[in-house]
Curated annotation (Swiss-Prot):
One annotated Gene Ontology cellular component of this protein: basolateral plasma membrane
Principal location listed in the UniProt entry: membrane
GO molecular function, one term: water channel activity
Domain remarks: Aquaporins contain two tandem repeats each containing three membrane-spanning domains and a pore-forming loop with the signature motif Asn-Pro-Ala (NPA).
Highest taxon of the lineage: Eukaryota
Biased composition (Low complexity): 12-22
PANTHER family: AQUAPORIN OR AQUAGLYCEROPORIN RELATED, AQUAPORIN-9
Signal peptide: none
UniProt-annotated glycosylation sites, renumbered to this chain: N215
Keyword Repeat carried by entry: yes
Species, as recorded: Milnesium tardigradum (Water bear)
Membrane topology designation: Multi-pass membrane protein
Protein name: Aquaporin-10
UniProt-listed InterPro entries: Aquaporin-like (IPR023271), MIP (IPR000425), MIP/Aquaporin (IPR050363), MIP_CS (IPR022357)
Length: 409
């Protein structure tokens, strides 16, 4: 038998609220009529439904209104929510919400990269400006590992939490990120790092003046203070070794990221991945941080370096010239700035290729029965087909912006 109809007010955002039975028509609101039908063994129940909807028979579709789940009563192209009844929080949310997925992802990458530098370089500033009294190289490694983890936690649900142009490039090469999004991701990452460097500089401005007397170009201190923001090589390092350092260190980073996010592998639950990526960065720093400070991220190095160029350190931040270090230092690496940019991009591509050819391309046809996938931005169609074939049961796929989940039905 048919229950009394209720009216549902539907907004363009997908939220719905139940309206009174007597429908108050608002010109900027779309209402839908729904009828709840209870089916029993009594023939009268079905007859009631047919009789109740006899007058609403649609000859075009051949269906009665009672056979439809919803029927629009009032339509409008204007705002679906009555602005007069919105709370302040709802109004702010409505005014500030961005409709473009790419713009939201760019904001997420900006904020994640900002968090990475504001914590990571903040630790470096504390160690350098206190002359080691408030930390050491281990503190820097731990601080950067935690900074990476928090940055990925913040941005991961929206953009994947790359925070690194080299990682974004590798994901694009693997087909996990559309190429059209790559320039936007990179721009957001560089912008976030530059802004974060400005915050670190402002917070430690007085301590910096106390350290170098306000002279950013002083020969015996400029590189140590500029090194708060960007990487600089040891005086014994040749450019060939520095480039190899960045290529291989970043390839290790990319191999680890792909292993952690590959659901066919023995990866962790999705919520643990940012912590393990932070541990991976910390391990790279502990193993390969001596030569040049393991930038392994073009935005992390070039963004703050651009800030130091504008904030008083001058062109030395790019030329690497320092007369206070023995004479052949400048001849060994006359221009260091390009190595932490080119090296990580090459290294990320190398790491992606290594993982693909050694691991990713060799999974058995029917891998273990994975009931839930949480991988961010990648196509899971192959996994879904394999799981359905193995279980011999249909698979219902629920797709959202951030994750793709599959379960048995």
């Amino acid at each position: 038998m048919a229950d009394a109809p209720t009216y549902i007010r539907q907004s363009t955002t997908g939220t719905a609220t139940t309206a009174p039975t007597t429908m108050p028509v608002h010109p900027d609101t779309t209402y839908y009529k729904t009828t709840t039908t209870t089916v029993s063994d009594a023939p009268r129940a079905i007859a009631d439904v047919n009789d109740d909807n006899h007058d609403n028979y649609d000859e075009t579709t051949g269906l009665r209104s009672g056979e439809k789940k919803t029927r629009p009563l009032v339509t409008s192209t204007t705002a679906p929510i009555d602005a007069g009844r919105m709370t302040l929080g709802q109004k702010i949310s409505r005014w500030t919400r961005i409709g473009s997925d790419l713009a939201r992802e760019a904001l997420a990458e900006f904020l994640g990269s900002f968090i990475l530098i504001v914590f990571g370089n903040g630790v470096v500033a504390q160690v350098v400006l206190s002359r080691g009294a408030h930390g050491n190289f281990l503190s820097i490694n731990i601080g950067y590992g935690l900074a990476v983890a928090f940055g990925v936690y913040i941005a991961g649900g929206i953009s994947g939490g790359h925070l690194n142009p080299a990682v974004s490039l590798a994901f694009a090469a693997l087909g996990k990120l559309p190429w059209r999004k790559l320039p936007v991701y990179m721009f957001a990452q560089y912008a976030g790092c530059i802004c974060a460097s400005a915050i670190v500089h402002a917070i430690y401005y007085d301590a910096l003046n106390n350290y170098d007397g306000g002279n950013r170009t002083r020969g015996d201190t400029w590189q140590s203070t500029a090194g708060i923001h960007a990487s600089y090589p040891q005086e014994f390092l040749y450019w060939q070794t520095g480039l190899a350092d960045q290529i291989f260190a970043t390839s290790f980073l990319m191999i680890g990221i792909l292993a952690l996010t590959d659901n066919r592998n023995t990866g962790p639950p999705g919520g643990v991945v940012p912590i393990l990526v932070g541990c991976l960065v910390m391990a790279i720093g502990l193993a390969y941080g001596f030569n040049c400070g393991y930038p392994i991220n073009p935005a992390r190095d070039m963004g703050p370096r651009l800030f130091t160029l504008m904030a008083g350190w001058g062109s030395r931040t790019f030329s690497n010239y320092n007369p206070y270090i023995f004479n052949d230092y400048y001849q060994r690496i006359p221009y260091w700035f390009w190595i932490p940019v080119v090296g990580p991009h090459l290294g990320a591509l190398l790491g992606a290729a290594i993982y693909f050819f050694f691991i990713g391309n060799h999974w058995p046809t029917l891998h273990r029965n994975v009931l839930e996938l949480q991988v961010g931005h990648r196509d899971n169609s192959d996994d879904i087909e394999l799981l359905a074939a193995k279980s011999r049961r249909p698979i219902e796929v629920v797709t959202t912006t951030e994750t793709t989940r599959e379960r048995r039905t």
